[in-house]
Regions:
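Cap/insert and terminal regions of metallo-dependent hydrolase folds
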Residues: 7-19, 86-173
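Core dinuclear metal-dependent hydrolase active-site scaffold
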Residues: 31-97, 173-191
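Alpha-helix C-terminal capping segments
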Residues: 1-4, 70-71, 161
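Residue-level signal for beta-strand positions within conserved beta-sheet cores that form or flank
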Residues: 24, 41, 164-166
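Short low-complexity, flexible loop/linker segments enriched in glycine and/or proline
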Residues: 24-26, 44, 150-152, 184-186
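Active-site HxH/HxHxD metal-binding segment of metal-dependent hydrolases
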Residues: 1-38, 46-56
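Structured loop/turn residues at beta-strand edges in well-structured enzyme cores
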Residues: 3, 26, 43, 63, ...
């Protein structure tokens, strides 16, 4: 995939792994929280906080976990990354004012992991705080790390969306999603 990639923007310390896998240094941009990278045609990526950890075993926390805001000439797209619930969402909402799409973690959670994975009971508050025009949830329906049913994350957020005026989009993996069509609907494919 590397030949098809223009730039890789990531948190501090992740670039060394990509370089090991053959990515040239001139394609790698590492950012600390609150730093941004300006790209061509008015695009900018800002690294923002997330609440997680990095690494496994004895080599933990040697790289930075992040969320990102992609700012285009006409849209703000927030990619929440792998994160537990935290108060920094209010700071992000204040800084960016309008968020057109929030892509948020929703799955592979446990009460024991609440600091690093958003719980279903916390997700509506995250969405309310960020106040995005549209929401897509990720980190679900692909692999199992937790003890909940594979479809539980989607069931819970779909129910919550109905009760909390959330413009939730649930495209099937690979299905086309049109950011400029807030009325686009998707079937509940997981049922």
């Amino acid at each position: 995939i590397e030949p098809k990639v223009g730039k890789v923007i990531t948190g501090l310390g992740v670039g060394e792994h990509l370089a090991y896998w053959g990515y040239p240094a001139d394609k790698l941009i590492e950012l600390d929280w609150q730093e941004n990278a300006t790209l061509a045609d008015g695009f900018m990526v800002t690294a923002l906080p997330a609440r997680h950890f990095s690494g496994r075993g004895l080599k933990r926390n040697q790289s930075l976990w992040s969320s990102f805001m992609l700012t285009t000439p006409s849209k703000n797209v927030y990619v929440g990354g792998d994160s537990g619930y935290a108060t920094f969402y209010a700071d992000i909402a204040k800084r960016f004012n309008t968020i057109d799409l929030a892509i948020l973690e929703n799955g592979q959670y446990s009460d024991n992991w609440a600091d690093i994975h958003t719980l279903p009971s916390q997700l509506p508050q995250t969405i309310k705080t960020l106040n995005p025009k549209q929401v897509v949830t990720v980190h679900n329906s692909k692999f199992v790390l937790a003890n909940h049913a594979w479809d539980e994350p989607l069931e819970k957020i779909a129910e919550s969306a109905k009760n909390n005026d959330i413009n939730l989009k649930t495209p099937m993996i690979g299905e086309i999603f049109y950011l400029d069509d807030p009325n686009q609907t998707f079937k509940a494919w997981w049922r």
